[in-house]
Amino acid sequence: MLFSKVIGHASLKARLIGNMREGRVAHAQLFMGPRGCGNLPLALAYAQYLLCENKGEADACGECPSCLQIAKLEHPDLHLIFPIFLTDKVKVCEPYLSVWREAVLDDPYLDIDHWRDLLESENKQLRMGVDIAQEIQRKLSLKSFRGGYKVMLVWLPELMDPPAANKLLKVLEEPEPGTVFLLVSTDADQLLATILSRAQLVKVLALRPTELAEALQGHYPELSQDDAMALALRSEGDLVEAMDMADNSEEEIFIFFRDWLRACYRREVPTTVEFADGFQKLGRERQKALFRYGLYLIRQCTLQWQQVPELVRVIGQEQEFVQNFSKLLTDRNADRIREELETAHGHIERNANPKVLFMDLSYRLMGLLRPR
């Protein structure tokens, strides 16, 4: 992965390259950022720059034997660790390595939900157990194939079981010479504090709307500039979310959410039952996408209600919705509506019954929007 292929983050790229050229390479670095920010492709680009045999001032050469191997994620000094569905027979990453390589080469902005779908483990927990930590130790005991750095990239280390995390900590405390750990995380709160203290933080921010809109138009040539910007604003810098909305018709999601809230406000129980049936048919990923989008809209409504319209980021039909729905917000219900949607999103992630959950949420919103 070349830095030039990573969307945005110009100043961060320059800092990473500058550190390398000045010989300031921390043995453990935590690429921390929200979903869809590009922390995985950034870490891969940094790994390629570390291992490149003919580094340029702004990027790896892309042509040397090392670069050609990394382009396929097959460099012998680049070790890849990631969460898997653990079974009695499969406890390490190796059996899934070709699948993960293919997934990342197809989409370097891969997220945990899409990885879970690829493994067909929708209702199962992806983890990294102690055997994977031992796998890390084994790989680091090998000599560098090309005599340079050995790079250990750990994707989503927050999904390590406690015993595995403790073993990783010991490796970080006593690193092998010439070893660089690249930890790629979306939730540092779940990492051991001692691991955080051993790693240099590389903070990766969400993509800027202009950067994201440009990337969307490059991927979807049929998108107008206005539509691309609308998706960029709605996804709040999350490329994965923006592309999911582009693939699944964000207008349909908006209409579903708007009309459902209208039914809740009017206390139209039969209509909300119909919406619950429709919600159940969406599938788990689109159900989660609906709640994420709904949370975005509610945040915009809250900003409008708080009389800071200059911070509101909506266009088109959403503007009318925000102006109207914000009039229903009060000190009593504004935070509660957001909390209910966040809770519902979490329950869907944990495989709650979609129809039961949606009806329960509908009744709760009825009470918040029009208390008796």
Regions found by a protein language model. Name each.
Residues 1-49, 55-58, 65-69, 177-180, ...:
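Charged, glycine-rich active-site and insertion segments that engage polyanionic ligands
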Residues 138, 170, 197:
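Conserved adenine-binding aromatic site and its adjacent loop/helix in ATP-hydrolyzing domains
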Residues 2-163:
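Clamp-loader machinery-focused feature within the broader ASCE/P-loop NTPase space
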Residues 151-155, 168, 179-185:
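Structural recognition of the conserved hydrophobic beta-strand(s) that form the central parallel beta-sheet
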Residues 141, 166-180:
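Conserved catalytic/switch belt of AAA+ P-loop NTPases
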Residues 162-166, 288:
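Conserved strand-to-helix beginnings and helix N-cap segments that scaffold or border functional pockets
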